UniProtKB/Swiss-Prot annotation:
Entry protein name: CTP synthase
InterPro entries the UniProt entry points to: Class_I_gatase-like, CTP_synthase, CTP_synthase_N, GATASE, GATase1_CTP_Synthase, P-loop_NTPase
Gene Ontology terms: cellular component: cytosol
UniProt catalytic activity: UTP + L-glutamine + ATP + H2O = CTP + L-glutamate + ADP + phosphate + 2 H(+); L-glutamine + H2O = L-glutamate + NH4(+); UTP + NH4(+) + ATP = CTP + ADP + phosphate + 2 H(+)
Organism encoding this protein: Lactococcus lactis subsp. lactis (strain IL1403)
Domain (Glutamine amidotransferase type-1): residue spans on this chain: 293-535
Its job: Catalyzes the ATP-dependent amination of UTP to CTP with either L-glutamine or ammonia as the source of nitrogen. Regulates intracellular CTP levels through interactions with the four ribonucleotide triphosphates.
Pathway: Pyrimidine metabolism; CTP biosynthesis via de novo pathway; CTP from UDP: step 2/2
Annotated positions binding CTP: 14, 149-151, 189-194, 225
Residues annotated to bind ATP: 15-20, 72
Region annotation (Amidoligase domain) ranges: 1-268
Amino acid sequence: MSTKYIFVTGGGTSSMGKGIVAASLGRLLKNRGLKVTVQKFDPYLNIDPGTMSPYQHGEVFVTDDGAETDLDLGHYERFIDINLNKYSNVTSGKVYSEILRKERKGEYLGATVQMVPHVTNMLKEKIKRAATTTDADIIITEVGGTVGDMESLPFIEALRQMKAEVGADNVMYIHTVPILHLRAAGELKTKIAQNATKTLREYGIQANMLVLRSEVPITTEMRDKIAMFCDVAPEAVIQSLDVEHLYQIPLNLQAQNMDQIVCDHLKLDAPKADMTEWSAMVDHVMNLKKKVKIALVGKYVELPDAYISVTEALKHAGYSSDAEVDINWVNANDVTDENVAELVGDAAGIIVPGGFGHRGTEGKIAAIKYARENDVPMLGICLGMQLTAVEFARNVLGLEGAHSFELDPETKYPVIDIMRDQVDVEDMGGTLRLGLYPAKLKNGSRAKAAYNDAEVVQRRHRHRYEFNNKFREDFEKAGFVFSGVSPDNRLVEIVELSDKKFFVACQYHPELQSRPNRPEELYTEFIRVAVENSK
């Protein structure tokens, strides 16, 4: 079977949920027995989002092979339950840098390097590479931003050319457009959707399907009007309405026959998607019997997207305990030893996620200290693990001024130090310890029990600093347990205090591998204990 290509674009405005549409369609097609992969095109000039501010971009999602990517890849993985790779996120910066490198090497043999054909050819190559490296039957490529944006023009042209290159039966264009709801007048307006589809046609692409983003349902008459003006079959005009839970969306799209229309267009003979298990999960999620409050102490809490995988992993873990997770967003900059009880005291558990830089670290340390002294279930992630070690060094071992070398290069007690292979690294981007690495688990530890007594777990990392092994013996003597280490025993991966209800911190990012129907084990145990603690 020829590889099938589905392109998801957006018009009118950005942030309409194109990624959720792509992820939901991917789940439906996977449940038809098809092998699906998904890809995100980001037209910005950064090589990747690794050095971008979380306030600008939100979370950086890390793949198994160590690519720093757009947060939409997290949605793709969680919805479809697949592991993506470095070819699943392509930026203008990445493409242009590769082309310029080739030009400097003389690989274009003296040709004038241009947007067409050189940039468009490389974009088409990236699409095909993402499909071939995963042996996918179908690749869904989402283009970030809005059709008509100056920076996205080469991407749209590459998508246009794909139809002629691989055949009309192997390509489908899905355009996501907004329907404006004027609440005061009680009216729905379609002109933005019509003009957005017209703009796509001006670039040579006729949409095969429209997905209408709306707060309220659209009438059949309005659907038919949009279909006529946009030259799309009425049955291929799909509504994507606001929902209580994101995981309802695949079911809503299936109810409108979206996946069957896609299969018909692409000449795919695939059985109907069996969504029984997914539907049962959604029913469970919408009828949780318990509630648990978790304090998330972070430095980017004004933008929840900066912690989207963390919050989703907490929710997934809550599902397994039949509990809705109520997140109390606590700005680490506001936390002190004096007010920490007021800010986190009503929480049944505390999570201290990752981050970079000095701002907010003392507040995180105060929250960790509060959790340790009051036996509140605590989970530390990445920097959260490093600061767990710093707090223990200061307040249990009595090492006044102990810190991470990253945050205080003058400290007498650098309990967190730079990794040996990072000492001479000058570039910030793409140089961290990234991707999937193993952690060997200690017998009898809380971590090993959480992971069902596995000997080794593989989890994704994103860090440059590590626990300083010069202090390991002193920590162990004081009851600090190193419950997960690298197979060569050199890198600390998990730490815990065994005399607490749950006091565990890990260097890796377990949330990146959590799924709604398969929650990550460390998060699951954390929430289970927090639910018990809230009784």
